[in-house]
Amino acid sequence: MLRIVPPKEIQGEVIAPPSKSYTHRGYFLSLLADEKSIVERPLISDDTLATIDAIRAFGADLIEEVVYPPEELRPNYIFARDSGTTARISIIVSSLAKGVSVIDGREQLRRRPMEDGVSSLRMIGVEAIGKRLPVKVFGRGRISAKEVSIVAEKSSQFATGFLILAAKIGLKVEIVKPVSKPYIEMTLKTMEEFGVKYDKAQENERLVIFVDPGVKGTKFKVPGDYSSAANFLVAGALYGKIRVRNLMRDDVQADKEILNILREYGAKVKVKDEYVEVESNERNPLNVDCSNFPDLFPLLAVLAAYAEGKSVIRGRQLRIKESDRIHAMAVNLSRAGIRVRELSDGLEIWGGQPKGFRGKTFNDHRITMALAILALGAKGESIIPETKSIAKSYPNFFEDLMRVIK
């Protein structure tokens, strides 16, 4: 249990942790590379440990930051913990392991949909069973198919899985109704780091990517994480001034969009090569569709709770993340005395002065961190009964938070 009393001042500097999304991609591409790779400064969290376990199960050796890929992937039991990225990429990559692989996870992950990836595996001649975890894949070892189509309106993670598979075998990947497009761009950017060549074209609601085979062993330095840094950037926009280092100015991460949103909110945003700095100023209401950056939704709801007016925050896949994030934030904002109306795809939020509250995290790391940021400016003491969920993506979050509380 964590008790938060609003501090007198919020100001300081933190270093953004390594990116979870890039860490996943770097490890899976290292698994399929032609020789050893170095994944430099990876994020170590529950989700990325699941990916480390997965690539080892497929036959890779990992010694400190060096990944030695196997000559051939071996079929195995993959336990993805609560990591949707680990599970979905493993389902696709296991098609290269000749034999039966089973991909499973914890109860929370077992509730998330897997049928789109399973259906697309069948298109390339790979039998797979399961609409949700556990999923059983009957790997072929060698795949002769030349193209695949994946519906990505619920998640871009299977699209990433097929792009990583394509980097190994060569494949035309058609992504239908892609949601979270920046995550696909992040996958392509990481593939480039591993020497993968590709061409892409946009055709109406389809993104078509022609990927040449060949993943080269490389030294891949994991960039800082805009998703985790967003917690502190939002805190700066609301309460004081915070500087975050280790963020790439030209990154394609989806959650880099937080910088544009904070400018719209009225905050002072300074972007340099060495850091990003955000200082509080105005608190304008927001109207945002976060379908391309769903992990920002809880923090955008926090911004809206303090805004001067009515905000609308929407996103297509918000109900099928680690929790139903729309409902989760509606519950918590209501407990903080903020008027909120739940929509099918988002929230209407009438901003004001949140009061101290007893939060409910729904065992969702993003909700937990957002509630901590919400509590910093609330009128009175707030209680967050569960904080273990942050281990999924940002184990040192509360230690870093203490650096900016005066």
UniProtKB/Swiss-Prot annotation:
Keywords tagged on the record: Amino-acid biosynthesis, Aromatic amino acid biosynthesis, Cytoplasm, Transferase
Binding site for phosphoenolpyruvate: 20, 84, 112, 157, 325, 366, 392
Binding site for 3-phosphoshikimate: 20-21, 25, 155-157, 295, 317, 321
PROSITE patterns in the record: EPSP_SYNTHASE_2 (PS00885)
Gene3D superfamilies to which the protein is assigned, alphabetical: Enolpyruvate transferase domain
Biological process, per Gene Ontology: amino acid biosynthetic process; aromatic amino acid family biosynthetic process; chorismate biosynthetic process
Subcellular location: Cytoplasm
The protein's annotated pathway: Metabolic intermediate biosynthesis; chorismate biosynthesis
InterPro entries: Enolpyruvate_Tfrase_dom, Enolpyruvate_Tfrase_sf, EPSP_synthase, EPSP_synthase_CS, RNA3'P_cycl/enolpyr_Trfase_a/b
Key word Cytoplasm present: yes
Active-site residue numbers: 295
A GO MF label: 3-phosphoshikimate 1-carboxyvinyltransferase activity
Location (main, coarse): cytoplasm
Annotated Gene Ontology cellular component terms: cytoplasm
Catalytic reaction equation(s): 3-phosphoshikimate + phosphoenolpyruvate = 5-O-(1-carboxyvinyl)-3-phosphoshikimate + phosphate
CDD domains from the UniProt entry: EPSP_synthase
Protein's job: Catalyzes the transfer of the enolpyruvyl moiety of phosphoenolpyruvate (PEP) to the 5-hydroxyl of shikimate-3-phosphate (S3P) to produce enolpyruvyl shikimate-3-phosphate and inorganic phosphate.
Oligomeric form and interacting partners: Monomer.
The protein's name: 3-phosphoshikimate 1-carboxyvinyltransferase
Species name: Pyrococcus furiosus (strain ATCC 43587 / DSM 3638 / JCM 8422 / Vc1)
